[in-house]
Amino acid sequence: MDRRFLFALFLFAAVATAVTDDTNNDDFIIRQVVDNEEDHLLNAEHHFTSFKSKFSKSYATKEEHDYRFGVFKSNLIKAKLHQNRDPTAEHGITKFSDLTASEFRRQFLGLKKRLRLPAHAQKAPILPTTNLPEDFDWREKGAVTPVKDQGSCGSCWAFSTTGALEGAHYLATGKLVSLSEQQLVDCDHVCDPEQAGSCDSGCNGGLMNNAFEYLLESGGVVQEKDYAYTGRDGSCKFDKSKVVASVSNFSVVTLDEDQIAANLVKNGPLAVAINAAWMQTYMSGVSCPYVCAKSRLDHGVLLVGFGKGAYAPIRLKEKPYWIIKNSWGQNWGEQGYYKICRGRNVCGVDSMVSTVAAAQSNH
């Protein structure tokens, strides 16, 4: 094989891997492959001024301001690289553009790793897939609450959990009720005794299946209005007499996209995990990055639907996609939602999927 081709292939792989590397060397790697005179940096100061105004950003000192401006410029470079590697989506300036990669992970992700399933978890039964619709969206059927905002607290797992149970409760009762994430943040400390670091721990991360286990053991969850979200860890104030939704059972869906779609249609929105490496710069469109590690799951989200395709002129084809409800507020992505390619487990979106059934309730 031609040596020049091998070298070019190696260089592409190295650069692509650097884009999604979770180490703290992201910015250093980026500087190696991007010309310092990139035209999109010529107006960086103007972009930063607009960014501060749009997202109400302020900094206590000039030193902090100047530091954040430097981070912002690095993230402009990162967004351009993401655009090149994920051309079917739009990447650019977001509410997270003044955060380093490590700050973003620490403050806005929070999914923990787990090798074993909780005691009450079971494998979801195999469902028929022959009559699946081409498009499906639980938002159109009234089973999804408005997009919420976890703030700078690693509680994504709690929002994924409540979102799935909100949908299941709607299917069981016909009532859409916003459930309390703060109850999970404060009260859920379910652990796997055989795996170190697997405990749900509020703003320091957790797992959706752990949370379903907690809800089974505790008797359920109260409404959001009865236990409001604060975005920080607190003492448990759970009042069982105010429970409005409870878990009957929960299951883990096999790594098969047709089965995931079938479970979504039959059982309601699904709690899923994802590698969020491309989400810091995501603005809109169908995200289908060339490289995104499937095993590096670090963010809990809610799968609410799917579409048969959005035209991608760069790739000359329709790209079928999943519709993901995120918990970063409505001023991120597509009014708080994320579209990601279906078909090949992009960013591990098919790797950790759970469905929950709600108990019938008289509330």
UniProtKB/Swiss-Prot annotation:
Disulfide bonds join 153-203, 187-236, 292-347. Residues 19-131 form a propeptide. One of its GO terms (molecular function) is cysteine-type peptidase activity. The active site is at residues 156, 299, 326. The keyword Disulfide bond applies. It holds the Pfam family Inhibitor_I29. SUPFAM superfamilies: Cysteine proteinases. It is an enzyme of class 3 (hydrolase). Residues 1-18 form the signal peptide. It comes from the Eukaryota. SMART domains: Inhibitor_I29 (SM00848), Pept_C1 (SM00645). GO terms for biological process: proteolysis. Induction: By dehydration of shoots but not roots and not by heat shock or ABA. Its EC number is 3.4.22.-. Keywords: Disulfide bond, Glycoprotein, Hydrolase, Protease, Signal, Stress response, Thiol protease, Zymogen. Glycans are attached at residue 249. Belongs to the peptidase C1 family. This is Cysteine proteinase 15A. It comes from Pisum sativum.
